C-alpha cells in the first residue's frame, strides 16, 4: 500500500482526511496518468449516497477538467456500474466516490482503467509520485482545450439492461427480499428484480445522506434475516453501500455468506459446463469447509491474499471466471470486471430457479467449519511472520489438528494488528487454539 492508496483506492474521513483539496489532486493527477495518451479523454464519475459525495465529486471533477477531460457524471450508481459503463462506453477511465461498507463519515475514491479493471500497484504508485512532487508540472490547457462536464444519469438504465440479460429466465414465482443498505443500489436493485418479474419486498431503500450502512446491508445481515421471515420471502439479498458485495439469507432466515454463494454458483456452473477449468479463485480467509465441499465436487481451488483485487488478478492471469471472498465480493468475470452484488444476486437466483431447490438446501451442501478470528494489537505487525516462538506454537497446533482444521496468522493490511484465525471441528477447539497462539503473540510483540 502507498501513502494515499490503500487496498481499495483512497479512503478516509470526508473533509478531515479525504479533503476537497486532496480530491482535486487525485482527480488531476490520477486523471492524467490514466488518460495522458488521449487528447480529449472521456472519464465517467459515479458516487454512492453519502452526504459528502457532492463535495468530493465537485473537487474531483474540477481536477479532471483541469487536465482537459470530458467528464460524464453518472450520479448515484454502484461501483460495478461504473466499472461496466467505463468499458462499455469506451471511456479512458472511471471513478467511483464511495467508502463501500464503511460508516457515513468515511468516503473514498477509486479508479478504473478503460478496460473496467481496478488499477495496478504500478499505476497507483505513479499517481502518488506526481501528487508528491514539490511543483505541479502537468500541462494546464486553457480556453477551448479545458475539460467539459455533462450529466449522464441514463447510465444506470444502461447498466440495468446489461444485468437483465444475465438472467437465464425470468424470476416469476420467486419472492425476493432486498436490503440495499440505503446505498447505491437502493433504486437500481428494486427496479432490476421487479423487471425480472420477481415478487419484491425491500428494506434499506430510503437514503438520506446519513443512513448508509447504518444497521443495514451486507455487514448487518441480521436485519434482513428478520425481514425475510416477516415477509415469507424465498431469499434475502443484502448489498453494501456501493453495491459490490452480496450476502444472502435463506428462507429460514439463516445467513449465507460469500463462500457458500461461491460454492453454490460454482457447482451449478460446473454442471452446465460453464466453469472454466473447473476452478474457483478465493482468498486465504475462505472457510475450510468451502475447500472440502469444492473438492468433493471435483472443483479445484486457488488461494490469493486478502482483497478482491488479488482475486481478480489471479483470475485474469489464468483465465478463470468465478472467484471471490467470504465477505461477499464475488466476481463473475464472464460478465463484469469487479465484484458485483446485483450480478451475483442474479447468478444465485438463476441457480435457485434451475435446480428447484431452496437456498437452505443448496447452502447445506457446504458444511462450514467453526471459525474464530481474534485481533492482537502489536508493536510491529510484520515481525510476526519471522518470530520463532510464534512459528513453533502454530506448528504445534497444526500437528494436533491432523488435517481437520486450519490456522492463519497474518498482519492486517490496514491497522497495527496481527489477525489470528482458527478453524476446527468444534467451537471449543477453535477457542483453545486461538487462545494458545494469541498468548504467544502478545508475549512476543503485543502492546496494551
From Swiss-Prot:
Keywords: Isomerase, Magnesium, Metal-binding, Phosphoprotein. Its EC number is 5.4.2.10. The modification Phosphoserine is found at residue 100. GO terms for biological process: carbohydrate metabolic process; peptidoglycan biosynthetic process; UDP-N-acetylglucosamine biosynthetic process. Its cofactor is Mg(2+). Pfam families: PGM_PMM_I (PF02878), PGM_PMM_II (PF02879), PGM_PMM_III (PF02880), PGM_PMM_IV (PF00408). The active site is at residue 100. GO terms for cellular component: cytosol. The keyword Isomerase applies. It is an enzyme of class 5 (isomerase). It comes from the Bacteria. GO terms for molecular function: magnesium ion binding; phosphoglucosamine mutase activity; phosphomannomutase activity. Activated by phosphorylation. It catalyses: alpha-D-glucosamine 1-phosphate = D-glucosamine 6-phosphate. Mg(2+) binds at residues 100, 240, 242, 244. Binds 1 Mg(2+) ion per subunit. Catalyzes the conversion of glucosamine-6-phosphate to glucosamine-1-phosphate. Belongs to the phosphohexose mutase family. PANTHER family: PHOSPHOGLUCOMUTASE (ALPHA-D-GLUCOSE-1,6-BISPHOSPHATE-DEPENDENT), PHOSPHOHEXOSE MUTASE. NCBIfam families: glmM, PRK10887.1. This is Phosphoglucosamine mutase. It comes from Bacillus pumilus (strain SAFR-032).
Amino acid at each position: 500500500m502507498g501513502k494515499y492508496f490503500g487496498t481499495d483506492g483512497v479512503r478516509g474521513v470526508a473533509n478531515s482526511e479525504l479533503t476537497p483539496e486532496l480530491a482535486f489532486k487525485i482527480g488531476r493527477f490520477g486523471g492524467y496518468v490514466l488518460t495522458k495518451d488521449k487528447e480529449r479523454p472521456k472519464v465517467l464519475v459515479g458516487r454512492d449516497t453519502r452526504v459528502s459525495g457532492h463535495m468530493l465529486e465537485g473537487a474531483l471533477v474540477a481536477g479532471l477538467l483541469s487536465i482537459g477531460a470530458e467528464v460524464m457524471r453518472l450520479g448515484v450508481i454502484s461501483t460495478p456500474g461504473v466499472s461496466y459503463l467505463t468499458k462499455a462506453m469506451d471511456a479512458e477511465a472511471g471513478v467511483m466516490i464511495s467508502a463501500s461498507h464503511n460508516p457515513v463519515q468515511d468516503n473514498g475514491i477509486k479508479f478504473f482503467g478503460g478496460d473496467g479493471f481496478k488499477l495496478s500497484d504500478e499505476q497507483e504508485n505513479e499517481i502518488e509520485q506526481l501528487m508528491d512532487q514539490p511543483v505541479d508540472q502537468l500541462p494546464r490547457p486553457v480556453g477551448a482545450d479545458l475539460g467539459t462536464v455533462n450529466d449522464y444519469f441514463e447510465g444506470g438504465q444502461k447498466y440495468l439492461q446489461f444485468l437483465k440479460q444475465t438472467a437465464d429466465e425470468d424470476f416469476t414465482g420467486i419472492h425476493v427480499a432486498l436490503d440495499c443498505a440505503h446505498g447505491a443500489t437502493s433504486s437500481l436493485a428494486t427496479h432490476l428484480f421487479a423487471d425480472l418479474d420477481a415478487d419484491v419486498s425491500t428494506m434499506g431503500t430510503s437514503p438520506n445522506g446519513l443512513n448508509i450502512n447504518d444497521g443495514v446491508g451486507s455487514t448487518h445481515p441480521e436485519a434482513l434475516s428478520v425481514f425475510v421471515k416477516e415477509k415469507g420471502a424465498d431469499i434475502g439479498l443484502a448489498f453494501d453501500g456501493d453495491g459490490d458485495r452480496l450476502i444472502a439469507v435463506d428462507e429460514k432466515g439463516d445467513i449465507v455468506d460469500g463462500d457458500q454463494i461461491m460454492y453454490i454458483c460454482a457447482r451449478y456452473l460446473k454442471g452446465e459446463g460453464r466453469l472454466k477449468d473447473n476452478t474457483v479463485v478465493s482468498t486465504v480467509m475462505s472457510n475450510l469447509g468451502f475447500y472440502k465441499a469444492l473438492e468433493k465436487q471435483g472443483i479445484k481451488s486457488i488461494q490469493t491474499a486478502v482483497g478482491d483485487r488479488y482475486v481478480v488478478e489471479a483470475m485474469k492471469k489464468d483465465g478463470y471466471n468465478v472467484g471471490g471472498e467470504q465477505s461477499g465480493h464475488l466476481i463473475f468475470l464472464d460478465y463484469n470486471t469487479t465484484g458485483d452484488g446485483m450480478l451475483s444476486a442474479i447468478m444465485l437466483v438463476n441457480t435457485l430457479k434451475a435446480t428447484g431447490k431452496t437456498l437452505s438446501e443448496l447452502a447445506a451442501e457446504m458444511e462450514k467449519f467453526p471459525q474464530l478470528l481474534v485481533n492482537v494489537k502489536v508493536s510491529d505487525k510484520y515481525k510476526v511472520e519471522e518470530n520463532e516462538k510464534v512459528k513453533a506454537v502454530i506448528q504445534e497446533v497444526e500437528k494436533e489438528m491432523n488435517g481437520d482444521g486450519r490456522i492463519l496468522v497474518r498482519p492486517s493490511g490496514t491497522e497495527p494488528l496481527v489477525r489470528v484465525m482458527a478453524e476446527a471441528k468444534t467451537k471449543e477447539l477453535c477457542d483453545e487454539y486461538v487462545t494458545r497462539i494469541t498468548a504467544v503473540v502478545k508475549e512476543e510483540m503485543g502492546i496494551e
